[in-house]
């Protein structure tokens, strides 16, 4: 915890507006997330009472080790629904979820009453480019369960698997799709 505490203090000192902790196991082991994981995640943000610093967590569902891999392990589809209420009741301001590489039943979004959701709409390990129309449809699907002010569009995760030109194309389409809202 000393390393996390040191990093947290540096972020506060440097006036970071956002502090994000990636969480690789909550979606794979939701029972552990509920039993002790979320409490430990909150400890990462201990003493950040400054309202100008947004506390974010990314809940990873799993990604392949190369572009366009098909059969690789992913977290169970019901994972987000098992932990959404507890995350909303935590001190986390924003939860980042992955939806593009495996569509979720978005009913769990209604559990987020106070927490914002970064909604993954672009596959980060696929060379297939999402259409503007499919992104718009998925945003509309999400807005059936969560207020527009709480929804932030984004790629599923980091863009490290994608060549730079492809990443730019995907992001441009995502921005165009989201600008219609």
Predicted features, each with a name:
Residues 6, 33-53, 111-117, 173-181:
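Alpha-helix-loop-beta-strand connector modules within alpha/beta enzyme cores
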Residues 15-37, 58-67:
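Active-site-proximal loop/short-helix segments
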Residues 13-23, 54-59, 97, 150-155:
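Short beta-strand segments at enzyme active-site cores
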Residues 30-38, 68-76, 105-112:
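Distinct, well-ordered alpha-helical segments
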Residues 1-12:
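Single conserved hydrophobic/aromatic residue that forms the stacking wall/gate
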Residues 79-181:
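Catalytic-face loop-and-helix region of soluble metabolic enzyme cores
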Residues 27, 59-70, 101-107, 160-164:
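Flexible glycine/acidic-rich beta-alpha junction loops that bind and position SAM and/or redox cofactors
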Residues 6, 66-78, 126-132:
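Active-site mouth loops of central-metabolism enzymes
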